[in-house]
Each structure stands twice: as C-alpha cells, then as structure tokens.
Design a protein with these regions (language model features):
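Conserved aromatic-histidine-acidic binding/catalytic patches
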Residues: 37-40, 72-75, 122, 140-148, ...
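Helix-loop junctions and short alpha-helical segments
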Residues: 50-130
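Charged interaction/catalytic cores of defense and host-pathogen modules
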Residues: 1-84
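Alpha-helical oligomerization segments
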Residues: 151, 162-247
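Residue-level detector of well-ordered alpha-helical segments, enriched
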Residues: 41-48, 148-152, 175
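Short, hydrophobic, well-ordered secondary-structure elements
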Residues: 145-162
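Surface-exposed polar/charged interaction patches
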Residues: 55-58, 137-141, 163, 185, ...
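A long, hydrophobic alpha-helical segment
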Residues: 127-146
Length: 247
C-alpha cells in the first residue's frame, strides 16, 4: 500500500508498506520513499487521513486517570492540533471536505451541488450527512447503500413533486421514472409482479446499474436546487414588486 504523510514528519514523501509487513519483525528495507509513486490511489490517502483524524480526536478524550504517566496528568505525547491542521491542509489541497456524524469523521470530494442541498432548508438534518456521504469512496460498489439513500431522497421529493413539475416538467418526469423503474422504490426484478417487473433491469450489469444510481442521485440534487430556486423566485418577485411600486 502506498501512503502519504504530507506534513506528518516525512516532508511530502511517499512510502510503501510490503504486503507481509506486520507478520514478521520490521526490517529497514520494509520502507522506502517515493517522490512520485507509480501506483498511488487517492482512496488510500483518504483512508489514512480518516484513520489519523479519528485517532487524534479520540486521543483528546482519553481520561486523565488512564494508567500511564504520573498521577492523573496525561503526558502530551502528541501535538493533536498540529497534526489535525496538517490533515486539513492535505484534504483542502486535493479538493476534499470533512463530514462528521456521531463523532466519526469522513472525507469526501467537494461537490458544490451536494453541499448546497445538504445545507438547504428543504432537507432535514438527519439526511444531510447521507447526501454528502453518498460520494464517499467506501460507497463504490455498494448498490444497496446507494439504493437506501435514493429511497430516502425519493420520499422527501414525493410531497414536492407537484412543485417540481411546475419548475421543470422534464426533470420531474425523468427522475420519478428512474425511482419507479430502476429497482429503487419498487421491486422491478421479481417476475411474479408483472406490473413492476422490468427484464432489462434484471439483465443489467451491476456497474451499469450503479452508474444509473449515481445519475439518479445527481438528478435528485438538481431537483432540490430547482425547488429552492422556485422559492427564491417567489421572494424575488415580491422584492421586484415592492421596488417598482415606489418607482
């Protein structure tokens, strides 16, 4: 595995850990540094940053009477804020952002649309994290997890379907078609239910189905932004009327 410790004491260098490391005594040749690694994967960097971030945060909450050091004084073995700052700089430089729920932090690629929707008044707080975390690397290939998130988004959009139709009829029609025919809200893969059964979906490869789940997610974001713009337009019209009445 290739890992990056940018600012972690090795000055922007990369090192490789052999597959059998940890199964035998460490040797000097176990670690080597690469300025420009050939098999670097961004997910490994994110994994490392998440591991370090959560480890450092947990370290801060170790009780003072934890059995090490002298008396009840916890030795400051680690400059926590320094390392958290270094992690933050790495995450910022690669265009990622932090998302936290229940005290656990993950890093996801920045998406202006996802951020805007997650912070919208149209979305309850408990769903905001799911909107952001949909883009997390651990979600790749996790069709059931993605499906679960899409079901929640569909449930939230359903009561607003009429407003969405007025704002963008094509988007409304296409999005709810995907909800209802892509094995998201309905079981479209059970031949016993002829009304909902879609043979094409049964034959679809998992990679293609995941692609369309991701497209559905993007369309959900667009739908929320359209709904927000509809409310914004109402406020704008009121402002415009007030300005014109006194002109």
């Amino acid at each position: 595995a290739i890992l990056c410790y940018n600012g972690f004491g090795v000055s922007r260098r990369w090192f490789a850990i052999p597959q059998d490391a940890g199964k035998r005594p460490e040797r000097k040749e176990d670690f080597h540094f690469e300025k420009e690694p050939t098999n670097f994967k961004i997910d490994e960097l994110i994994l490392l940053c998440e591991y370090m971030e959560n480890l450092l945060i947990a370290y801060q909450y170790i009780p003072l009477n934890f059995p090490y050091g002298y008396g009840n004084m916890r030795p400051q073995f680690i400059n926590v804020q320094f390392y958290l700052q270094q992690i933050g700089q790495v995450i910022e430089r690669i265009g990622y952002m932090q998302a936290t729920q229940n005290g656990f932090t993950i890093f996801v690629e920045k998406s202006p649309a996802a951020i805007a929707v997650a912070e919208s008044d149209l979305v309850p707080k408990e769903l905001s994290y799911r909107i952001i975390s949909y883009n997390h690397y651990s979600m790749k290939g996790q069709l059931e997890a993605k499906k679960s998130a899409l079901v929640q988004l569909a449930s939230l959009l359903e009561p607003k379907r009429g407003s969405l139709k007025k704002a963008d009829k094509t988007l409304e029609s296409d999005l709810f078609y995907l909800f209802n025919n892509l094995n998201i809200r309905h079981n479209n893969v059970d031949p016993a239910d002829s009304a909902k059964y879609k043979p094409f979906i049964v034959q679809m490869k998992q990679e293609e189905l995941e692609h369309w789940y991701d497209e559905t997610y993007q369309m959900c974001l667009l739908a929320f932004l359209q709904l927000e713009q509809t409310e914004r337009k109402i406020e704008f019209d009121r402002l415009k009327t007030a300005i014109e009445e006194q002109t």
